[in-house]
Every structure is written in C-alpha cells, then in structure tokens.
Amino acid sequence: MEDNKIRVGITQGDINGVGYEVILKTFADPVMLELCTPIIYGSPKVAAYHRKSLDLSTNFSIVNSASEAVPNRLSVVNCTDDEVKVEFSKPDVEAGKAALGALEKAIEEYKEGMIDVIVTAPINKHTIQSEEFAFPGHTEYIEQKLGDGEKALMILMKDDFRVALVTGHIPVK
C-alpha cells in the first residue's frame, strides 16, 4: 500500500539543544504518525542518546534516504559523523557542523522531491557559522539554496491562524 501522507523532513538542529527533545516527544504521540511521514535528518546515535536521556520509548527506523522512510514510523537519515558527542547546552563547533550537515541533506532531498516540506529544529547561530554557512539563520540559508532569487518568508501556523515575520534577527533595544 502506498503512503500518500505528507513527507516531513525535520533537521536535527543543534545536537546539544532542544531539537531532539521536541522531535521525539512530538512523535511519541501515535496520532502524529497518522498525519505525516516524519524523516529526521541527523544521527541515529544522537537520537538514541536523547531518547534514553529523556526516558522515552519513541521508536525510529534508520534509513539511507527519505525514499526509504517507513510509513507510520519515525525515520532517521544519518548525515552526521557518528563520533560527534552530545554535551547538553554547550556550544560546540562540531555540533554546528552536524546541524549544517543535516540541513544540507534535507535541502538536497527536498530538491529531489523525496520530502514535501522542511521543518528545522533550532540551531546555535554562532557554532554553525563557517565558509558554507555565513547567514544569520536558517531562513536566509534556505532562501539562498531554494529561493531562485526570491525572498523567503517564515510563517508560523496553527489551524486557521498564521503569523508571518516582517523582520528577522533585528534586536529590540
């Protein structure tokens, strides 16, 4: 039977942050798996580490790409060095590289039509900075990779309520 649910690519974000906690707790609810086919771009080892530290039973399958995602189950595409270490709340350049690797793989598979949307977990905007990523945040990076010269707009939605951000990364003083 073919799975016609929306295929949601979810980037792991900063492995030392709240990303995996939010993802794993969200998909601990079986109802969420009825709504979509979720694919985490990240590390199965890091996901398992967070699952254990949170005492969750959220199961996932390890796949090579979103094309192998298992319906009604969380899948993880490994796009991170297996030796990366998790140190909760600690800024780390390797965690920044892992966040970027996940984002790049999600964008690649989005372009190939393997996923329908990309959801990004929070990054550390300092540790992700590199020659490949010199942007204030996800939105600008995704805009450059997928925007075809058009501007991107971040939208937050719930049912019939939508909020679009008019400015980004401008501090209120």
Predicted regions and their residues:
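Contiguous, glycine/small-aliphatic-enriched amphipathic segments in soluble metabolic enzymes
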Residues: 1-138
